[in-house]
Amino acid sequence: MEHGEKNITIVDDKGNEQLCEVLFTFDSDQFNKSYVLYYPIEAQDDEEIEIHASSFVPNEAGEDGELMPIETEEEWDMIEETLNTFLADEDEEE
């Protein structure tokens, strides 16, 4: 996983692969981590999409990076606030 990627493939605990579109990535100085927000590409335009979030270590060697779960309630609060700001900015642009 690197900043700027448009699509990522998520593999669930059963080994199923799902292609997802990256909504955006960002860094948090507070938690000293990078985060990615993404959603399944197969979601229909008229459906409400479920946005997922993970932390990751930016990869400099061109290898596949590893997504990691969000660990604390404080991280979730920060991610939710960042997402709400992003969505509000998107609405203003339309």
Swiss-Prot record:
Superkingdom of the source species: Bacteria
Cystine residue pairs: none
Coiled coil: none
Entries under Pfam families matching the protein: DUF1292
UniProt xrefs under InterPro entries: UPF0473 (IPR009711)
Family: Belongs to the UPF0473 family.
Protein name: UPF0473 protein BLi02866/BL02030
